């Protein structure tokens, strides 16, 4: 639940994904202590009482790391909020997600009714954030299957941008795939990964 993908904790009563967005999906600062603790424990005679100690130490270190990332995220949100306000952006919702190990690099997405404002911040450098604006283009989803559109919105938790390329509709998901703004010639997109759908002739 601490990653951007989240966990559906309330199934089968609700398909809501709980996600605290404090660590990357692959973060060795969390997994390595657990693995070292487990491997060390397996190397100890199973009849010794001390066998569980390495596992508990690894679990404690990983848990402490998770708690620290919660505090880091709160500070990061304050930084993005201040930078958005400084640049005159009045947003409705704010998403902040780590994009590297150790929760060092973060992307922030300020969402308005019509646009997403995306910026990057490095904890070590403390840089001023430059935001890029992308229109949401929600109306383009009306050209594809309603159920599919609803599923795509659910998966992105509302943080998406839609674009039309030729006869295809692309949905860029900022919640689960924030890799940063990409530029291809004169074409700029909010992140590298996207879902691509070909609308039916009847819409």
PLM features per residue range, with description:
Residues 49-74:
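Internal/C-terminal transmembrane anchor helices
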């Amino acid at each position: 639940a601490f990653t951007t993908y989240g966990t559906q904790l309330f199934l089968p009563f609700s398909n809501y994904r709980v996600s605290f967005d404090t660590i990357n999906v692959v973060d060795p600062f969390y997994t390595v202590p657990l693995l070292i603790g487990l491997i060390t424990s397996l190397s100890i005679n199973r009849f010794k009482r001390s066998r569980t100690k390495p596992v508990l130490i690894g679990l404690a270190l990983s848990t402490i790391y998770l708690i620290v990332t919660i505090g880091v995220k709160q500070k990061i949100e304050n930084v993005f909020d201040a930078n958005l306000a400084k640049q005159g952006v009045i947003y409705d919702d704010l998403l902040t997600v780590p994009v590297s190990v150790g929760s060092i690099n973060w992307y922030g997405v300020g969402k308005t009714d019509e646009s997403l404002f995306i910026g990057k911040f490095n904890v070590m450098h403390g840089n001023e954030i430059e935001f890029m604006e992308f229109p949401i283009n929600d109306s383009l989803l009306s050209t594809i299957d309603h159920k599919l559109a609803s599923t795509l919105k659910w998966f992105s938790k509302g943080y998406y941008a839609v674009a039309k390329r030729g006869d295809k509709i692309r949905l860029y998901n900022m919640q689960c795939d924030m890799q940063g703004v990409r530029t291809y010639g004169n074409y700029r997109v909010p992140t590298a990964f996207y879902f691509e759908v070909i609308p039916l002739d009847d819409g």
